[in-house]
């Protein structure tokens, strides 16, 4: 679906309109940093041929379904054993717009992988939220808005936060109701670095405040929320996340910088992820309709978050490494029927290899090992709560 998002109220956050595509493509074709970044993914890229193909794209839809699709599938081919999706029968009928809310593992690929698979099953690609903290270079903002992303403003003052949230929420409601285009948003601000996936109440409150009803629950139901469970066999950034945990433990004032975000994006895109699976879960409006819309606000938000979390926990796909990690972390053999000696040996070798990549002056390997084991066992731990 390729509809203009023309409202001037959203000019600073919306995706590009089709009338802006030509200028955006010219900017990208002339940008050496953009070319350099693409060569990481496609080392043998013929830039002249690619530039011609870029200029042939007259709409966002053409760009997304050809060049962007090809780039994402190249990443999948080079860095995954498989990329699969299930639950397509649960997608809204007649391609009705919805809000996909998922757990969050990879800065770039969560939404990118979801979109190529939705395209393959005939549903169509979504609009995607991206934090402005990741727009480290001007060409990145041009690219993501060309690729139908809208901008989430992160670094604003407390005084500005309410207004920024209202505008963002109003835009999402606009995309769903007026443009009839689905939206992807993570269940929390930033990745769940310990893989303990929990929907943040602040995200749900933000989604509700741009609605046209005076009730939080009804406004969220208007967005037709569909949870998505994302399951990576291996997280290429697990060692970076563990390193950050130790740095924050040792220095409570530690704050990561732009270089860290760039490294995480690059590491996530270029390195092995093994099997990757997306499960489309059931739309939750029927479950939300059973809640008391007049419940105390924070209690209601918590109840809605639990509905989303439960769908994600129940539909997570587990690999041998998840079971091995749980047993190693807890000193048990509870899940030994789900893996063999070879699986255990391979994961232990993988774990040590990731730990060896961490360079810190006071490296606490026992702590780092525990953190990585938690990343792989927490989804299983959360699943067990649904039984």
Region locations from a protein language model:
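Soluble or luminal CAZymes and related metallo-dependent hydrolases
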Residues: 67, 164-168, 300, 304
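Membrane-anchoring hydrophobic helices of lipid-metabolizing enzymes
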Residues: 1-98, 104-115, 119, 141, ...
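C-terminal intrinsically disordered extensions
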Residues: 46-52, 211-220, 225-231, 293-300, ...
